[in-house]
Amino acid sequence: MTAATASFRHRSRLAPLLEAWSGLTAFLDVGVGAVLDLAIRFWLAKIFFVSGMLKIVNWDVTIFLYANEHPVPGIDAATAALIGTGIELLCPIFLVFGIGTRFAAIPMFLTAAFLQFSYKELTDHALWMVLLTFLILRGPGALSLDYFIAKHLERSAIPFSRSLY
């Protein structure tokens, strides 16, 4: 038996294992990965939405905090509070449904970064920034409206339409 024949037989024995591994990783990416993406989106949406609701309920306190605790340079406290609250109430809705997820995650990331670097350095904010970066770079996953819409845009004339989800 030559070395080439032995090598071929060795590779042919590995082929089923490699195919099984490829199938497993594809399943994990589409199946488990999609559920994990959905869980991340829901978890972040809950955190930001609850924060926005608390700001509305205590609007005077919210304006006080934006004026004294974490002022935004160049913007008065009421305007900054309105922008911040708007981000915390609107963007999570987009995350939950998985529509425009990348675009919705950007202002949420900027909000978390602002709080991390100007107010208090908390591990929670850092974790949120990591997960939001994940959503910005990877997209919302297969369990999202973005994914289902993009499947119908494969032959669209819209540039980069396939990469939107």
Identify the function of each model-found stretch.
Residues 1-60, 74-86, 90, 97-165:
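Extended, low-polarity transmembrane helix blocks
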Residues 61-69:
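Short Gly/aromatic-enriched secondary-structure transition segments
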